[in-house]
Swiss-Prot record:
HAMAP family: NDH1_NuoN_1 (MF_00445). It comes from Erythrobacter litoralis (strain HTCC2594). The keyword NAD applies. NDH-1 shuttles electrons from NADH, via FMN and iron-sulfur (Fe-S) centers, to quinones in the respiratory chain. The immediate electron acceptor for the enzyme in this species is believed to be ubiquinone. Couples the redox reaction to proton translocation (for every two electrons transferred, four hydrogen ions are translocated across the cytoplasmic membrane), and thus conserves the redox energy in a proton gradient. Keywords: Cell inner membrane, Cell membrane, Membrane, NAD, Quinone, Translocase, Transmembrane, Transmembrane helix, Transport, Ubiquinone. This is NADH-quinone oxidoreductase subunit N. One of its GO terms (molecular function) is NADH:ubiquinone reductase (non-electrogenic) activity. Signal peptide: none annotated. It catalyses: a quinone + NADH + 5 H(+)(in) = a quinol + NAD(+) + 4 H(+)(out). GO terms for cellular component: plasma membrane. Belongs to the complex I subunit 2 family.
Length: 487
């Protein structure tokens, strides 16, 4: 009976695994001409998985009924919230890929299969209740991501991005494994509940180093300073649909996993990791903003923007309260929409031959040549900057509010001050598009799926998005409470 209950809880993961294997077989037998069909089937699988996990989120599932395989897997509402964000992000990335790869005659059915496998790994990551489960999910995601980064085999930038991601990712995995071995050595267990119980009271120096190494390994996955060095090169070199994927779904999974690890197995030793998270948050905000200022390549700029936004997300985690975690999830959801919209807009910047345009010089005067695209980008950039009344302001507001409520007034003040620096390079987007002389380089026609996603993202981050804040706040409060109950 217990096995049946456990299998029911992991049904979305089972469906994704079976679907991925079936799609691989279809690809092997039929060949590249099935690329679009495989993409549609992969997106349908992810949509079905999202429907399966939705009831756990809306009901606020938590406690023993959400535990599978003796604590190895947790299907609570916190995991469900993260999974829905991950699945929807992956679906968006599948929608935008064909138009990009078709121009290069590189649309292969392996792309949606790899996205599906990476998403399966992320799904396992956010539901991990054991260090071993954590590592299995993380590596399944990472191995698929390495291949995706170098998907354009004949493109030197893509190959370089894949190689850098692989080498630095392997280093991060080694650091994480070493930390896990120290935690196991000093607690005698890999189970989150067991580790939490063993770390009650005074923490040994060895266990403290284990916590530090585990968090360092996870910091690489979320691209937090000082483990951010791979992000600009990989984001610039990888195909833009892959970069979009990296900036959204894996970011959600890694942040959710970091929160679960910090508050579940290490929840009794908040003081051991809180200062680390505060440092990473402030360093990411400042270095992300400063690094972006001198960039001329738009993809590299958005990579630094991603690092900057991770800092704001980590402020919510640093608060280590239900309100802080809820604010973190709220910001994460808003960030996914902003990032997806921004990279879709970059995909739409191309000349008459379909060649991508990726520099500020290419978008000079865009408001006169492509006004709809320019206005959508304006909404997204101002929202990323946190300028009211756009929805990005609300994300920053709830994060800073949670920090103040947790008596971290100085952290909130420093975060607000640093966000002013970050606003500079977002405003540069607007200045170039609306006030520079037009160059009229953007001439290519855009795919319908691109326009649909871009307009949807622009509407969500507009003041109309505030209509969703009550509903979103209820979901994030439920998800955050479930993690604290599990802890």
């Amino acid at each position: 009976m217990e096995l049946n209950a456990s299998l029911t809880l992991i049904l979305p993961e089972i469906v994704m695994a079976i679907s991925a294997m079936a799609l691989i077989l279809i690809t092997a037998y039929v060949g590249d001409k099935t690329a679009r069909l495989v993409s549609i089937l992969a997106a349908a699988t992810l949509g079905a998985a999202a429907v399966m996990v939705a009831p756990a989120l809306t009901s606020g599932a938590s406690g023993p009924d959400t535990v599978a395989f003796g604590g190895q897997f947790l299907a609570d509402s916190f995991a469900s919230f993260a999974k829905i964000l991950i699945y929807l992000s992956a679906i968006g990335c599948l929608m935008i890929a064909p138009a990009f790869f078709d121009r290069l005659k590189a649309m292969r059915p392996e792309y949606p299969v790899l996205v599906l496998l990476a998403t399966l790994g992320m799904s396992i990551m956010v539901s991990a209740g054991d260090l071993i489960t954590l590592y299995i999910g993380l590596e399944l995601n990472s191995l698929a991501a390495y291949v995706l980064a170098s998907f354009l085999r004949n493109d030197t930038r893509s190959a370089e991005a894949g190689l850098k991601y692989f080498v630095l990712g392997a280093l991060a995995s080694g650091i994480l494994l070493y930390g896990m071995s120290l935690v196991y050595g000093f607690t005698g267990t890999t189970d989150f509940e067991g580790v939490r119980g063993a770390l009650t009271g005074d923490m040994s120096t060895g266990a403290l180093f284990g916590v530090i190494f585990v968090l360092a390994g996870l910091a690489f996955k979320i691209a937090a300073v000082p483990f951010h060095m791979w992000t600009p090169d990989v984001y610039e070199g990888a195909p833009t649909p892959v970069t979009t994927f990296f900036a959204t779904a894996p970011k959600v999974a890694a942040v959710a996993l970091t929160a679960r690890v910090a508050l579940s197995p290490f929840g009794e030793q908040t003081e051991a990791w809180q200062q680390i998270v505060i440092f990473a948050a402030l360093a990411s905000i400042v270095l992300g903003a400063l690094g972006a200022i001198g960039q001329t390549n738009l993809k590299r700029l958005l990579a630094y923007s991603s690092i900057n936004n991770v800092g704001f997300i980590l402020i919510g985690l640093a608060a280590s309260t239900v309100a802080g975690l809820s604010a973190m999830l709220t910001y994460l959801a808003i960030y996914v929409v902003m990032a997806l919209g921004s990279f879709v807009a970059l995909l739409m910047l191309k000349d008459e031959d379909g060649t991508p345009l990726e520099t500020f010089d290419d978008i000079a005067g865009l408001s006169t040549t492509r006004p709809a695209l320019a206005w959508c980008l304006l909404f997204l950039m101002f929202s990323l900057a946190g300028i009211p009344p756009l929805l990005g302001f609300w994300g920053k507001f709830v994060v800073f509010q949670a920090a103040v409520q947790a008596d971290m007034v100085l952290l909130a003040a420093l975060g607000i001050a640093a966000s002013v620096i970050g606003a500079f390079y977002y405003i540069k987007f607007v200045k170039v598009m609306f006030f520079d002389d037009a160059v009229d380089r953007v001439k290519g026609t855009s795919d319908t799926a691109h326009w649909v996603l871009l307009i949807l993202a622009a509407v969500v981050v507009s003041p109309l998005g505030y209509l969703l804040t009550g509903w979103l706040g209820g979901l994030t409060d439920s998800a955050a409470s479930a993690l604290f109950i599990a802890s």
